[in-house]
Amino acid sequence: MPQRLKQVYQDTIVPKLTEQFSYKNPHEVPKVVKITVNRGLGEASQNAKALESSINELSTITGQKPVVTRAKKAIAGFKIRQGMPVGVMVTLRSDRMYAFLDRLINLALPRIRDFRGISAKSFDGRGNYSLGIREQLIFPEIDYDTIDQIRGMDVSIITTAQTDEEGRALLKELGMPFRT
């Protein structure tokens, strides 16, 4: 079953962006390639339960099992040895990516307290967008009673856009609520 957002992209966004940026080839139109959801855990090296709950929460939110990221180097100031778990990460592509993006735009972001839109300045110069989420409770899949601590996550949306202007136009057409 094709994702709703993917269908909208193919039917309406591609022709609109082709006209706006006067692309000659339909493959020039920017598209979302992947979404990475990352959560760094400072206390994971001492607390295995925090790591386990983060894995469960991210797999519930994204629908895919996260990978445990480990420290590359030992850092004495942070009491971290090489190979210790320091976070969890999920890379979403294809249908799961579109499903997650749809839920993020239409369900999760509007549930943020005092939400007035997201910053349009978080582009990296190559059309990719990064967004920090302060608490996992904005996702409807997370049950308030089952969480042990409020933790945030970083969401990076990687596109094939060459410039920030193209990336912004793509995400705006997908429904991303940018602050005006």
Curated annotation (Swiss-Prot):
GO terms for molecular function: rRNA binding; structural constituent of ribosome; tRNA binding. Keywords: Ribonucleoprotein, Ribosomal protein, RNA-binding, rRNA-binding, tRNA-binding. Gene3D superfamilies: 3.30.1440.10. One of its GO terms (cellular component) is ribosome. It comes from the Bacteria. InterPro entries: Ribosomal_uL5, Ribosomal_uL5_bac-type, Ribosomal_uL5_C, Ribosomal_uL5_CS, Ribosomal_uL5_dom_sf, Ribosomal_uL5_N. One of its GO terms (biological process) is translation. Coiled coil: none annotated. Part of the 50S ribosomal subunit; part of the 5S rRNA/L5/L18/L25 subcomplex. Contacts the 5S rRNA and the P site tRNA. Forms a bridge to the 30S subunit in the 70S ribosome. This is one of the proteins that bind and probably mediate the attachment of the 5S RNA into the large ribosomal subunit, where it forms part of the central protuberance. In the 70S ribosome it contacts protein S13 of the 30S subunit (bridge B1b), connecting the 2 subunits; this bridge is implicated in subunit movement. Contacts the P site tRNA; the 5S rRNA and some of its associated proteins might help stabilize positioning of ribosome-bound tRNAs. Belongs to the universal ribosomal protein uL5 family. This is Large ribosomal subunit protein uL5. The lineage of its organism: Bacteria, Bacillati, Cyanobacteriota, Cyanophyceae, Oscillatoriophycideae.
